[in-house]
Amino acid sequence: MTDSRQKVLIAGGSSGMGLALARRCLDDGAQVTIVGRDEERLARACEQLGRPGRLRALAADISREEQVASLFERAGALDHIACTAADIQGAYALLPDLDMAAAQRAVASKVFGPLYLARHGAARLAPGGSLTFTSGIAAYRPQPRGAVVAAINAALEGLVRALAVELAPLRVNAVSPGWVDTPIWTHVAGDRKDEALQSMARRLPAGRVGRAGDIADAIAFLMANTFTTGTVLHVEGGHRLA
C-alpha cells in the first residue's frame, strides 16, 4: 500500500479501526501520524504500535476547526489523510429521548470533522494523494434509535462525492463499515454488545461481524488505488443483503 517515502495522517488513530489502520500502514513501511483528543490514549496507542522512528502522535479535536488548522501546521507534508474518528456517545436514542447536544456532537465529529480535515489538509497533500473517510451501514439499514447516525453517514457520503469533484485530482473516498467489533459498540449497545454482535453474525452472509483489520485493509486499498475516487466501498459482510 505505502512505502517509507509516504506519510499518512489518521484521525481517530488511537483505537479501533484507526489503530488497526496505523498498524497496517506501519507494517507497509509508511510514516504515520495518529491524531486523537485524548493524550493518554494516544500515548498508549504509541506503546502498542512501537516504531518510534516512523510514528508520532498529535492531539487535536477534529470537530473544532481551529484545532484542525493547527494540526496541519504541525503535521507538515502528507500523502494520505484518513479519518475513522466518531463521537456518537448518546446519539443512539429514540426521538423522544434523544439528547440534542449528543446529536450535535455526533454531527460535528462525523460531518464537520471531515470537512475541516479536507479544508485544511488538502493543500498539504502531495500529487496523487487521497482523503478517506468512514461512513457506515446505518445509512442503508437504519434501525430505531439510529436516526442521527443514519443521517450523518448519508451526509458524509454526499460530502465525499462533492469533494472528489472539487479537490480533483486528489482522490476522496469513503469506506462504509457494517457491524465491526470495536470499542465504539459500547456506546451503541451497552451491556448487550456481545449479544448484539453474535446475533448479527448469524444473520450475515459472511457468517461473522467485522474486525478492525477488515476496515483497515479497505482504507489501505483506497489509498493505493489511483483510479478510484468519489466512491463508497462497502465492507459489511453482506449486511445490505441480509
Question: Locations of the language-model features?
Answer:
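Conserved glycine-rich Rossmann-like NAD(P)H-binding loop of the short-chain dehydrogenase/reductase
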Residues: D28-R44
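Rossmann-fold cofactor-recognition segment
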Residues: L49-E66
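Conserved glycine-rich cofactor-binding loop
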Residues: S14-G16
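Conserved Rossmann-fold SDR core element
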Residues: E157, E166-T182, T228-V235
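C-terminal substrate-recognition "lid" of short-chain dehydrogenase/reductases
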Residues: R208-V235, R240
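Catalytic loop of short-chain dehydrogenase/reductase
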Residues: D87, D97-M100, Q104-V107, V111, ...
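Catalytic Tyr-x(3-8)-Lys segment
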Residues: K193-D214
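Substrate-binding pocket helix/loop in short-chain dehydrogenase/reductase
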Residues: Y92-L95, D99-Q104, A196, M200
